[in-house]
Each structure stands twice: as C-alpha cells, then as structure tokens.
Amino acid sequence: MKVLATSFVLGSLGLAFYLPLVVTTPKTLAIPEKLQEAVGKVIINATTCTVTCGLGYKEETVCEVGPDGVRRKCQTRRLECLTNWICGMLHFTILIGKEFELSCLSSDILEFGQEAFRFTWRLARGVISTDDEVFKPFQANSHFVKFKYAQEYDSGTYRCDVQLVKNLRLVKRLYFGLRVLPPNLVNLNFHQSLTEDQKLIDEGLEVNLDSYSKPHHPKWKKKVASALGIGIAIGVVGGVLVRIVLCALRGGLQQ
C-alpha cells in the first residue's frame, strides 16, 4: 500500500509539471504579417540635463527601426528637463555701506528667456536658515535684489522661488545667506593674507609651487609677538633675581 501511495503521489506531481507545458507551448508561433512589417520609433541616445538643479535641457536622438533592425529617419530633439528644483544655499559676507546684488538669473533661465518665469522672494531676517516657517514675504518681483548701501538690518536668508509663467510650476528654489558686518569687526581683505606665490596665481600667472614663501603677517601681529617675547624674558629674569635675593636673606638669617 505504501508503495502504491508513493507511486500515485509521484505520478501526480509529474502530471502537474508536464500538463502546463503541453497546454501553453505551441508548436509554431505565428506572427501577423502587419506586425512583421511594423516600424517603431526608438530613443537610441540621450544626454544628461544641462544643469544639476532648476530647469535645463537635454538632447534625445530618435530613430525609426524596422524588422530588419536598420535605423532610419533619425532626429535629434531638445527637451526640457528638471533633475532637482532645490538648489541649496549661497553664502555672502559684506561690509556695511557696500553695494551688493542677489540674483536668481542663471544660464538655464537665460536659455528660456527671463519673461517665461515668475520670481518670488521671501526673507528670514537676521537668521541663516532653510526653515520655511521663519520666512516672510519680501517685496521684489524681479530676478534680483539690490542693496545700494547694505546695512546690518539687511542680514538674513533670502529665498528666491522661480516658477514658469505658463503653468506656475515651481522649477527652482535658491537660498542666499547674507551677513552684513561693520568694517571694524573683521578684516575681509582676502588678498592680504595670501602668500606671494598665491597672489601671483590669483592674478593668473604660473608659479613654481616647489619654492615655498611665508605668508604675509600684518605689522601689528609682529609687534604683539615681540612684546610677548620681551615680557616673557623680563619675567624669567625677574623671577631668577627674586629667588637669589630670597636665598641670600635666608642664609643671613641662619647665620
């Protein structure tokens, strides 16, 4: 009985695997003549978006491909693309009274034309942040915000939203972190802190970097270093003299 039961189970399993193959596998696969002659358009090449954020362009090459696999009537077309509409934050530090400008205008917008976009500005005054809750509307309808005489009150984060006029689609958001400082608070003369070689490189000249030159130090730093050195030397000498006097007095008292 056990042998018969085992044989029955194995036979059933074999039939279960074999039957679908018999039913679903045709002897010949007939393709209609119209389908054999069909021609389709296929994208054979595509470039990446011209920008990493905001609205840009990409190019696609489309060809007609027939049953023989030959490409015909190939055309290259230019399409809009949007990889990411959030473009991060740019940081700026300027002095009080300086003229300065923040601009949303970039190469991708120039490609389409400025009139195709709507610009909306918001401001988080006094803080550097990307938290939407701290922003308030800022009156500026153009692609830029200009400060004729920047003041500390102008410090904060400016957010520029760029939308397509035709459908109000948001295609770009850019943050500007602006710090306005008084001139006596910090020295922003970057060129002064460069070495002689770095200054030449900054001017576009070729320099042999194997020859090292010491960075420029302001005169007041040299004076402070000299004063500290003299003060330390006087302190050491004075300490030695005081110790000698104390030792002499102690020896006299003992006698």
From Swiss-Prot:
- Has UniProt tagged this entry with the keyword NADP? no
Residues bearing glycans: N45
Q: Where is the signal peptide?
A: 1-30
Disulfide linkage: C104-C160
Molecular function terms in GO for this entry? protein-macromolecule adaptor activity
Q: Which residues cross the membrane?
A: 227-247
Subcellular locations according to the entry: Cell membrane
Q: What PANTHER family does the annotation carry?
A: TRANSMEMBRANE PROTEIN 81
- Role of this protein: Essential fertilization factor required for male fertility. Part of a conserved trimeric sperm complex with the essential fertilization factors IZUMO1 and SPACA6 which bridges sperm and oocyte membranes during fertilization by binding to IZUMO1R/JUNO on the oocyte.
Protein name per its UniProtKB record:
Transmembrane protein 81
According to its UniProt entry, this protein's organism is Homo sapiens
Q: Taxonomically, what lineage is the organism?
A: Eukaryota, Metazoa, Chordata, Craniata, Vertebrata
State which gene encodes it: TMEM81
